[in-house]
Swiss-Prot record:
One of its GO terms (molecular function) is metal ion binding. GO terms for cellular component: plasma membrane. It comes from Rhodopirellula baltica (strain DSM 10527 / NCIMB 13988 / SH1). InterPro entries: FluC (IPR003691). The keyword Transport applies. Na(+) is not transported, but it plays an essential structural role and its presence is essential for fluoride channel function. PANTHER family: FLUORIDE EXPORT PROTEIN 1-RELATED, FLUORIDE-SPECIFIC ION CHANNEL FLUC. This is Fluoride-specific ion channel FluC. It catalyses: fluoride(in) = fluoride(out).
Length: 146
């Protein structure tokens, strides 16, 4: 029963993450400046990826603090500390919110259109800013849990 419950938690989290990603993209596309943003669909993907990296960094440090056992989660943090909840958030929500394959597809479209600079910038922003946000969030949570 545990395996099936884990799968259900991941599926539930995945549906939440997928809807969040769709809403982020819709918000960017319908923004007043969307005509100005020539990469508006890619901006939605980038925003979803960067938010996911930030959340994953915080979750990573949160998990590290739990393993270190010198910090005890209470309240909402105790609920998040449950292994099934971590699966639902990490693999479900964040896995479907962030989409590496969509990013690669969008960069390939720009490259095929001869927009090499746009393609390179899109990839670079996602990777470098995502990496920085991951560790920035981890540092914030580290300070909170110590």
């Amino acid at each position: 029963m545990t395996f099936v419950s884990d799968l259900f938690a991941i599926a539930l989290g995945g549906s939440i993450g997928a809807v969040l990603r769709y809403l982020i993209t819709l918000t960017v596309v319908s923004a007043p400046l969307s005509g100005w943003l020539t990469l508006h669909g890619s901006v939605g993907t980038t925003l979803a990826n960067l938010l996911g990296c930030c959340a994953l960094g915080g979750l990573f440090q949160f998990s590290q603090a739990l393993v270190a056992s010198d910090w005890v989660a209470t309240g909402w943090a105790a609920s998040l500390a449950h292994p099934r909840t971590l699966l639902a958030v990490r693999i479900g929500v964040l896995g479907s919110l962030t989409t590496f394959s969509t990013l690669i597809g969008e960069t390939a479209v720009f490259a095929s259109q001869g927009r090499i600079l746009a393609s390179s910038m899109l990839l670079g922003i996602n990777v470098i800013a995502g990496w920085c946000l991951f560790w920035a969030a981890a540092a914030v949570v580290r300070n909170w849990t110590s």
